């Protein structure tokens, strides 16, 4: 991020971050196939547990038929689950539809601290973000789940660079 004034304050940092988030919101999505689906292999088959959890929450219907190396299943969104759908695409010649579903979004909570680095005309800002998760966040990969954590907040360091000739 770029700061144009000579002293970066908490309120200035929050304003700059909020402007950037307004310009480019942080919203993440997962794809959920609905209709008749086959799940192959360990990674796909482990999703069956997630689908069962989403069904218990009333977000989808999930019917599975176990095979030796695959699950054949039927997945459909309920009215409650459809509230999270952003886009739907019917796949030609396939017995399923791909649904783009909101997984989580991140908004600014607060700037926790600012560490100025005068020799580099820079600052390191420790920032807290609120993570608003939907129930479909469970479909994210393990790396994403680790990055956003289990709680409602995540901290991140952001570097600011002062541009003397711009303001």
Regions found by a protein language model. Name each.
Residues 22-53:
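Post-signal-peptide N-terminal segment of Sec-exported extracytoplasmic proteins
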Residues 63-102:
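Accessory beta->alpha helical hairpin/"wing" motif in late/C-terminal subdomains of nucleic-acid enzymes
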Residues 86-126, 130-132:
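Extended amphipathic alpha-helical interaction segments
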Residues 2-3:
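C-terminal motif of bacterial Sec signal peptides marking the signal peptidase cleavage site
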Residues 9-29, 87-97:
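Short, non-transmembrane alpha-helical segments in secretory-pathway proteins
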Residues 45-63, 67:
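Basic amphipathic alpha-helical segments that dock to polyanions
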Residues 61, 124-126, 131-132, 138-139, ...:
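Short beta-strand edge/turn micro-motifs at domain boundaries
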